[in-house]
Amino acid sequence: MYEYIKGKLTHTDEAYVVIESFGIGYSIMLSERFLVDLRELMHQEVLIYVHSVIRETEHSLYGFSSRAERECFRLLISFSGIGPKTGLAILNMFPLQELCSVARLENVKAIASVPGIGKKTAEKLMVDLKQKLPALMPLYLEEPVVASSSTTTSFKEGIGALMNLGFSRLAADRMMTEAVKELSEDASVAELLPVALRKG
């Protein structure tokens, strides 16, 4: 089983990307939200955490921006009635942090709004998600998918601020990297953020 795939992003489609690594092209299914971020990185090196689905009629890879998101996906598909496509649809609509809030508030209506999930399935999900999701949050603090060239305090604080505004880790890292290039690594977070937001 693969942990992650690191290579050049060579193709994007409506539901998947192709990553070339050591002469092999890997087709990886992604959420729409993650796809939007990756389209900005065409022909660049990216790292995608993956989950393999192997069946008699299917051998697919599903990709995620972080280990935390992948573990959340694995938790979701462990529930009866939730397959890989539905699990991906849930993560597309609710990033991990937001999904934790939905579960904590037992917002059945929000989960039921995801295509492929009915009210009964949503109600069952709420019970287990409320108990199990918080355990995944420490993973949420891991490094961004695309390693940045800067590890300054301002850079890290900027990424955190952008994520609090709703940007994914990948998008926040890209925006801050571009802001640092435009200004400098010595720039304060107050100087970097306005520039980073323009890059979004």
Swiss-Prot record:
GO terms for molecular function: ATP binding; four-way junction DNA binding; four-way junction helicase activity. It comes from the Bacteria. CDD domains: UBA_RuvA_C (cd14332). Residues 1-65 are annotated as: Domain I. One of its GO terms (biological process) is DNA repair. Keywords: Cytoplasm, DNA damage, DNA recombination, DNA repair, DNA-binding. Residues 145-149 are annotated as: Flexible linker. Belongs to the RuvA family. Has three domains with a flexible linker between the domains II and III and assumes an 'L' shape. Domain III is highly mobile and contacts RuvB. The RuvA-RuvB-RuvC complex processes Holliday junction (HJ) DNA during genetic recombination and DNA repair, while the RuvA-RuvB complex plays an important role in the rescue of blocked DNA replication forks via replication fork reversal (RFR). RuvA specifically binds to HJ cruciform DNA, conferring on it an open structure. The RuvB hexamer acts as an ATP-dependent pump, pulling dsDNA into and through the RuvAB complex. HJ branch migration allows RuvC to scan DNA until it finds its consensus sequence, where it cleaves and resolves the cruciform DNA. NCBIfam families: ruvA. This is Holliday junction branch migration complex subunit RuvA. It comes from Chlamydia muridarum (strain MoPn / Nigg).
